[in-house]
Amino acid sequence: MMRTRKGHKVYPLTVAQKFHLYYAPHCPNMAVLNIGTSLTIEVELDWDQLKKSINEAYARNEGMRVRFAKDKEGTWYQYVMDPEEREIEFVDFSDKTIEEAEAEMQKWTTVPFKMFDAPLTRIVMIKMPDGFNGVYFLGNHMIVDAQSLICFLKDIIELYCNAKYEGVPYPKDMASYVEQIQRDFAYEAGSKAQLRDIEYFQKEIEKSEPIYNDLHGTEKLQSMREMFKNPELRSAFCVTDDTKSALDIFHLEAEPTKRLMDFCEKYHVSLACLLLMGLRTYYQKMNGFDDVSLTTTIARRATLKEKKSGGTRIIPSRSARSFHRI
């Protein structure tokens, strides 16, 4: 059993991290865990100051300094490295086309991280051909999700603006990643809250076996039922060996966007959860089943400390609703 690694206390993996390690080994390579994005603005940047702000953001964020290790028995552990000065890359795309720049960054996103005792994020300062400048960020889903990614990039922006412009306040401290996962482990160690949740979800699971829902309707499930000669089969294969990333941009008109945002504000629902409910409704209409199950690594954070502690979270979603009511 490992207790320390490189002088740092080690901790078990969280539920979300265990989930990622459940499916990732069955994929062609570990790049399936990569999250790549870019953030740019149409203004000239002080690259030296931006580099300082990036390193300062790393120093303020325990979750972005997480490393992983395995013991002799094959058990995974995580630990947090001390802050260190990182060499931040700079790439000038100004002599390229936008398409060439995007293609190059998509290539970066296909390169898997080393999983042991190594950084699991990468930042590149980028100068784009259209006059926009900023950063490309690549993170491993074992330590990053949408919420922690946004929070980290926001911190870089606020640190940079504080250093460059008068009257811009210094950002508030980030929350401790270690303290947050310790609270999670306390919950998982037989707490009353966990026991209540287990009882609830056990009842939900025992109601009926989840059924496969497909983007394109029931054809896949029907073919599985015929293959296995089981008309009551509720599961189906849905696998691919393609882990390539791609970029799709969808433009939503102003009026429906405003209605969505107003709904979220009025009922205190996150946009991610609203989109999840929309997916559930779509699957139900396409397949005709009352029961829809989704597993999604969304920003499951209820408190400010959870939102600012970084890391990756996961929430299962199962919805059963009469079809004729939709």
Model-derived features: positions:
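Active-site-proximal acidic secondary-structure segment that organizes catalysis
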Residues: 3-5, 10-12, 16, 91, ...
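Helical lid/core segments from catalytic subdomains that handle acyl or acyl-like groups
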Residues: 167, 199, 203-210, 313-326
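Structural preference for long, well-ordered alpha-helical segments in enzyme cores
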Residues: 16-17, 46-65, 101-109, 122-125, ...
